[in-house]
From Swiss-Prot:
Its main location: membrane. Part of the Sec protein translocase complex. Interacts with the SecYEG preprotein conducting channel. Has a central role in coupling the hydrolysis of ATP to the transfer of proteins into and across the cell membrane, serving as an ATP-driven molecular motor driving the stepwise translocation of polypeptide chains across the membrane. This is Protein translocase subunit SecA 1. The gene is secA1. GO terms for cellular component: cell envelope Sec protein transport complex; cytosol; plasma membrane. Residues 800-817 have a biased composition (Basic and acidic residues). ATP binds at residues 85, 103-107, 492. GO terms for molecular function: ATP binding; metal ion binding; protein-exporting ATPase activity. Monomer and homodimer. Part of the essential Sec protein translocation apparatus which comprises SecA, SecYEG and auxiliary proteins SecDF. Other proteins may also be involved. The lineage of its organism: Bacteria, Bacillati, Bacillota, Bacilli, Bacillales. Belongs to the SecA family. Keywords: ATP-binding, Cell membrane, Cytoplasm, Membrane, Metal-binding, Nucleotide-binding, Protein transport, Translocase, Translocation, Transport, Zinc.
Length: 837
């Protein structure tokens, strides 16, 4: 252990030596840079950009670029970065975390690597915890970047897509972590590439990196939509399929558990829902509901595939016979079963896109961060983000007095002592910052101070701007500020006149937070830049942390020594508290790691789908090659399921193949039973694919190439998006329910990974099938518009159309089902005299 500590300590010393050497090289260029005129300094930016274009790396430019940015800061901001700030900037450029104490000028430090990396032209994101700080820093530091000839954008929640696109197109973009994540998700839901706002993710510098990558790591970003308002449609589809007769209206393939409507069944469906053509792209929602109702009624059996109990449908595991709690069939099949069994159809709000901050920020080519407190989470940053935490020495020696904890037996005794301490310090004009863990504690102390007539401000992290304003004045003589969970991070507390003589800022902690890092943040508000200051934590045996980690022995020890109301100040107790905090931090790290492991399953799937969408949206030419692969996979699956080369030919179900092809791929009769008899499985596949190729060629002639390309895009995007949203929702249910399966020695994560993979595979096959069906069967219309997948469209009965004068019907001519009826009614043949034919 001692050897390990020595190693870590020595590597830290090595880092500092290397950084000092590099910073000295930058400082050596100070006179040369200072001699340049403003225009010549600005010209340097153009020169650097050209050198990057010609192949020089950013590392090659670091010393010169930092020297230019440093001189620029002096001229534009009146601030001249210290040596330690140059060191911090180098750490950030290298994609690590610079731990810099409060008041050491992190915001200015970040300008150096941000300037350098913006020279690549790929865009740099500066990330803050709230919009107030993003706005403030973009405005203040933007003066420097503009002076040096770089553009600065501010990405706020209220901006329109066009404004966001402009902000992201700038060399440097300030934003909150939430907005970046949501923009990424929204970009992967758009249907035209022009609607995307972000550029590929290159370099991000995160301010308060521990807050974003650690504290918020367990919170996923979710875009949810209203669930389908199609309860009625499930019920109608269910009622409709129950009127159908097997063989006449539909066929069932037992092997693949699939059901196909026959021509007659389709006509009945079109009449029942009062639509002209079920395969029209406008009617995909109806067709989907009919397909699921058919599956629910004719391939799924109660008490075999699922059970209905307590007003819900629960899935039965086919292998173990156990109920799979929390799991729901995807793509609306579960709702179709609910309609079949007459239980409540569940349509809660639907997760349409989701990502965790961990996985979002890991997509950047390079990630860096800065904070005053990261050392305690060093292992997490290394394991999850591959970032090292490097401590940057302070510019001036810290002379703050950090006192050992004061421990009381009861919570009341503790609060009385806190208020006494505040009153004493306030009387001599010393500013006091009181840190609490909960809002109730803030309010309790506030009411006690009111009773004593002590003027004070309370911060509860609600209004960021007012918060920053209060924090600015928190260092003035006689100021008392109560802050919950260190609200007001990001704004310095500067000491006012006469406060240094009063002892500087006194920080009082009313209990220890479960994370040492948060305690250190509170401490770090005092003693900035060599100022005097004092910090004191007050604890009681009734505090939550003490209760959770067995302080009964300590409590009885204190009572035995007659310390019931007095405080003890003991290093032993402080050490016990710290070890309790370490245990909590360990638990929290494990839980964040677990969130990441679960999200990694979805991450891999998300990357596949988003990549496919991106290719479709950006495709300039026909997507036929991609679509033909999907058709081929579908045909392979149908043929091998019904005519496997591994089974004797007498067991083949050739009629099943014909039924599927007729219903989903080609006009009825294009492939007949005679065509595929006495052929091998491979020959059957090739025969069907050849016929499909001919039909595809014919389809392509119906529209000009650009319009046909657009038709292909519409089909692909609509199918992929519908299936993906359903899949995410199903994965959500699986994630929620996986822990309820407490049988055997199952590992929930392994179970989630394997089931999630199966569900993804099923979704991909389902995408193939639907794309094949719509491309081959949908009626092609001009001026098709891509639209974001809209759920649960209402089914409107057809508007009354004026009667057209009917013409006599000539029986001898061959009329296609979708041709206009020769009687002149204006309807399609199948919906008019075709019914009688």
């Amino acid at each position: 252990m001692a050897g390990l500590l020595k190693k870590i300590f020595e590597s830290g010393k090595k880092d500092v030596k290397y950084l000092e050497r590099k910073a000295d090289e930058i400082i050596a260029l100070a006179d040369e840079t200072a001699a340049l005129s403003d225009d010549a300094l600005r010209e340097k930016t153009v020169e650097f950009k050209e050198r990057v274009q010609k192949g020089e790396t950013l590392d090659d430019l670091l010393v010169e670029a930092f020297a230019v940015a440093r001189e620029g800061a002096k001229r534009a901001l009146g601030l001249y970065p210290f040596k330690v700030q140059l060191m911090g900037g180098i750490v950030l450029h290298e994609g690590n975390i610079a731990e810099m104490k409060t008041g050491e000028g992190k915001t200015l430090t970040a300008t150096l690597p941000v300037y350098l990396n913006a020279l690549s032209g790929e865009g740099v994101h500066v990330v803050t915890v709230n919009e107030y700080l993003a706005h403030r820093d973009a405005e203040e530091m933007g003066v420097l970047y503009n002076f040096l000839g770089l553009s600065v954008g501010l990405n706020l929640n209220a901006l329109s897509s066009t404004e966001k696109r402009e902000a992201y197109a700038c060399d440097i973009t300030y934003s909150t972590n939430n907005e970046l994540g949501f923009d990424y998700l929204r970009d992967n839901m758009v249907v035209y590439k022009e609607e995307m706002v972000q550029r590929p993710l290159s370099f991000a510098v995160i301010d308060e990196v521990d807050s974003i990558l650690v504290d918020e790591a367990r919170t996923p970003l979710i875009i949810s939509g209203e669930a389908e308002k199609s309860t009625i449609l499930y019920v109608r589809a269910n009622t409709f399929v129950r009127t159908l007769t097997e063989e006449k209206d539909y066929t069932v393939d037992i092997k693949t558990k699939s059901v196909q409507l026959t021509e007659e069944g389709m006509t009945k469906g079109e009449n029942y829902f009062d639509v002209e053509n079920l395969f029209d792209l406008e009617n995909t929602v109806i067709l989907h509901h009919i397909a699921q109702a058919l599956k629910a009624n004719y391939t799924m059996s109660l008490d075999v595939d699922y059970v209905a109990q307590d007003d819900e449908v629960l899935i039965v595991d086919q292998f173990t016979g156990r109920i799979m709690k929390g799991r729901r069939f995807s793509e609306g099949l579960h709702q179709a079963l609910e309609a079949k069994e007459g239980v409540t159809i569940q349509n809660e709000s639907k997760t349409m896109a989701t990502i965790t901050f961990q996985n979002y920020f890991r997509m950047y080519k390079k990630l860096a961060g800065m904070t005053g407190t990261a050392k305690t989470e060093e292992e997490e940053f290394r394991d999850i983000y591959n970032m090292r935490v490097i401590e940057i020495p302070t510019n001036k020696v810290i002379i703050r007095d950090d006192r050992p904890d004061l421990i009381f037996t009861t919570i009341n005794a503790k609060f009385d002592a806190v208020v006494e301490d505040i009153a004493e310090r306030n009387a001599k004009g010393q500013p006091v910052l009181v840190g609490t863990v909960a809002i109730e504690t803030s309010e309790l102390i506030s009411s006690k101070l009111k009773r004593k007539g002590i003027k004070h401000d309370v911060l509860n992290a609600k209004q960021h701007e007012r918060e920053a304003d209060i924090i600015k004045h928190a260092g003035e003589r006689g100021a008392v500020t109560i802050a919950t969970n260190m609200a007001g991070r990001g704004t310095d507390i500067k000491l006012g006149e006469g406060t240094i003589e009063a002892g500087g800022l006194a920080v009082i902690g009313t209990e220890r937070h479960e994370s040492r890092r948060i305690d250190n943040q509170l401490r770090g508000r005092s003693g900035r830049q060599g100022d005097p200051g004092v910090t004191q934590f007050y604890l009681s045996m009734e505090d939550e942390l003490m209760r959770r980690f067995g302080s009964d022995n300590m409590k009885s020890m204190m009572e035995r020594f007659g310390m019931a109301e007095d405080a003890i100040q003991s290093k032993m107790v402080s050490r016990a508290v710290e070890s309790a905090q370490r245990r909590v931090e360990g638990n929290n790290f494990d839980s964040r790691k677990q969130v990441l492991q679960y999200d990694d399953v979805l991450r891999q799937q998300r990357e596949v789908i988003y990549k496919q969408r991106y290719e479709v949206i950006n495709a300039e030419n026909s997507l036929r090659e991609i679509i033909e692969q999907m058709i081929q996979r579908t045909v392979n699956y149908i043929v091998s399921s019904n005519a496997s080369s591994r089974e004797p030919e007498e067991d083949w179900n050739l009629q099943g193949i014909i039924d599927y092809v007729d219903a989903n791929l080609l006009p009825e009769g294009t492939v007949t039973l005679e065509d595929i008899q006495n052929r091998s499985s491979e020959d059957i596949q090739n025969l069907i694919l050849d016929k499909i190729k001919v039909a595809y060629d014919e389809k392509e002639t119906l529209l000009p190439p650009e319009e046909f390309n657009e038709f292909e895009k519409v089909v692909l995007l609509r199918v992929v998006d519908t299936k993906w949203v359903d899949h995410i929702d199903a994965m959500d249910h699986l994630r929620d329910g996986i822990h309820l399966r407490a049988y055997g020695q199952i590992d929930p994560l392994r179970e989630y990974q394997s089931e999630g993979f199966e569900m993804f595979e099923a979704m991909v096959s389902s995408i193939d099938e639907d794309v094949a069906r719509y491309i081959m069967k949908a009626e092609i219309r001009q001026n098709l518009e891509r639209e974001q997948v809209a759920k649960g469209e209402a089914i409107n009965p057809a508007e009354g159309k004026p009667e057209a004068k009917r013409q006599p019907v000539r029986k001898d001519q061959h009329i296609g089902r979708n041709d206009p009826c020769p009687c002149g009614s204006g309807k399609k043949y199948k919906n008019c005299h075709g019914k009688e034919a």
